């Protein structure tokens, strides 16, 4: 893995996404500029934290960050653009939504969206860069809450449990009940459930 050198600048935003793999719902992104004078203990990749810890950190990040913002790309945008381009769009929206303009942006993964300021992709950034960890927590808690809400409308699919990922249970329910308006039509399992040849 390439050595990561933190940029020598004051306002650094971290950006991450949640929800590229699910068959349903939006891809959700977050951008966060942390305040070095208000450290947050325990930031880590959101996937490695318990739900209780994520929720506590979610509130602390929003309270202590210099700026934070959420972005998203809806299922119809994912279907029109493809998941990669929709994710880049959602990241651009998160950065554009920051109340304070960052001087530099660090993005989790190996690809950066086109941004008006310098940026760098950081592989495994969600466990290496505090700002990206914070962004991953905001994005995951937000998307998980949306899946829990969708579960209330469509309890037969089990969205609260699998968060829309293609688990055996989800695929079984998709075959049995068909797709909701929130499913991503361009994803192969959804196309199969709708009887659309891929």
UniProtKB/Swiss-Prot annotation:
Species annotation: Cronobacter sakazakii (strain ATCC BAA-894)
PANTHER family found in the cross-reference section: RIBONUCLEASE H2 SUBUNIT A (PTHR10954), RIBONUCLEASE HII (PTHR10954:SF18)
Note accompanying the cofactor annotation: Manganese or magnesium. Binds 1 divalent metal ion per monomer in the absence of substrate. May bind a second metal ion after substrate binding.
Keyword annotations of the record: Cytoplasm, Endonuclease, Hydrolase, Manganese, Metal-binding, Nuclease
Pfam families registered for this protein in UniProt: RNase_HII
One GO term of the biological process aspect: mismatch repair
GO function terms (MF aspect): manganese ion binding; RNA binding; RNA-DNA hybrid ribonuclease activity
Domain RNase H type-2: 10-198
Binding site for a divalent metal cation: 16-17, 108
Record function comment: Endonuclease that specifically degrades the RNA of RNA-DNA hybrids.
Protein name listed in UniProt: Ribonuclease HII
EC class name: hydrolase
């Amino acid at each position: 893995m390439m050595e990561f050198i933190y940029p020598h600048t004051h306002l650094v935003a971290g950006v991450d996404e949640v929800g590229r793999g699910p068959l349903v719902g939006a891809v959700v992104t977050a951008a966060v500029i942390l305040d070095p004078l208000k450290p947050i203990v325990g930031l880590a990749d959101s996937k490695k934290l318990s739900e209780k810890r994520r929720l506590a950190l979610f509130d602390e990040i929003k309270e202590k960050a210099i700026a934070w913002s959420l972005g998203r790309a809806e299922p119809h945008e994912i279907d029109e653009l493809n998941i990669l381009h929709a994710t880049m769009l959602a990241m651009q929206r998160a950065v554009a939504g920051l109340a304070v303009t960052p001087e530099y942006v660090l993005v989790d993964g190996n690809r950066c969206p086109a941004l008006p300021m310098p940026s760098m992709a950081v592989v495994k950034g969600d466990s290496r860069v505090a700002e990206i960890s914070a962004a991953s927590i905001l994005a995951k808690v937000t998307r998980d809450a949306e899946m829990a809400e969708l579960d209330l409308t469509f309890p037969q699919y089990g969205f609260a449990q699998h968060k829309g990922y293609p688990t055996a249970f989800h695929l079984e329910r998709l075959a049995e009940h068909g797709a909701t308006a929130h499913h991503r039509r361009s994803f192969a399992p959804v196309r199969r459930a709708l009887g659309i040849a891929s």
